[in-house]
Amino acid sequence: MIDKNLTKENYRYNHYYLSYSRFSKFLECEAAAFSDYQTEASIAFLVGSYVDAYFSGEAEQFEQDHPEMFNSRTGELKKDFSRANDIIHRIAQDSTLMHFMSGEKQVIMSGEICGVPFKIKMDSYLKDEAIVDLKIMKDFGKVWSDAYRAYINFVEAYDYDIELAIFQEIVRQNTGKTLPCYLVCATKETPPDIGLFEIPQEKLDKALEAVKNNLPRYLQIRQGKVAPHRCEKCAYCRATKKARLISYEYAGMSGDELREEGIECNDEKVKPEEYSDNK
């Protein structure tokens, strides 16, 4: 369904719906996802957001909202954001990428997965043709994964397959059509590399199953039935950790590794949330 109460202006703050970004945080660290802890947006995040804003026609507003992009003395773009312009120009030069970026921008839809309300916002929605997401990254090389304890493809390392699986399912609920999903990508290298990548349907199906398998625990935590696990690696866990005496052999271990050793590291149970209270 398309909820008329869900708009571009309130999308970020409407917590009635679960978004991919919040679900992704939940997969990274349950405790952080259910906390009020806020971290400052990194330069890398802002650069990606600036490129997104350009292709959605919102670059001018983005610049007004983020004066830190500019050198306070000269008024010129700082180096990182000047590089973002190089990325924008590189994408704009490629007719194939621009076709996939020619869809309706920032389309919002909502639906349910396993009884949990979800919201999505698509970078480029080619009606009846494709779902397209724009990603900016360091390079296309493999990325270290703590979960797999190995270097893996960037798509799976950053959960882009999960993101597009959620998008595809919500679009299917709204339109009755299962659309192919693509990533328009560019790197921060000089000069930028570019790529157009399709996520195979079997990967999307597997990713959607992973979402469904994790939602029961998400609901249990949200309803205050179980305590969220700490990852003991992220900024939230470092900022809120309470010292306790353990063997030096456990130093630097993740929350999952500590739990495997029988050492509990959980936050307090959250206060139960009723969806209707946040709508």
Predicted regions and their residues:
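Metal-dependent nuclease catalytic cores that hydrolyze phosphodiester bonds in DNA/RNA
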Residues: 1-121, 232-235, 251
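Short histidine-centered catalytic/ligand-binding loop motif
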Residues: 38-40, 72-76, 145-158, 200-202
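Hydrophobic/aromatic-lined pockets within catalytic cores
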Residues: 55-59, 136-139, 172-175, 219
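Short acidic alpha-helical/loop segments enriched in Asp/Glu that coordinate divalent cations
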Residues: 65, 141-145, 178-185
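Secondary-structure boundary elements
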Residues: 97-101, 126-133, 171-179
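Coil-to-beta-strand transition motifs
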Residues: 115-119, 126-129, 178, 189-192
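Metal-dependent nuclease catalytic regions and adjoining charged, substrate-binding loops involved
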Residues: 154-161, 166-279
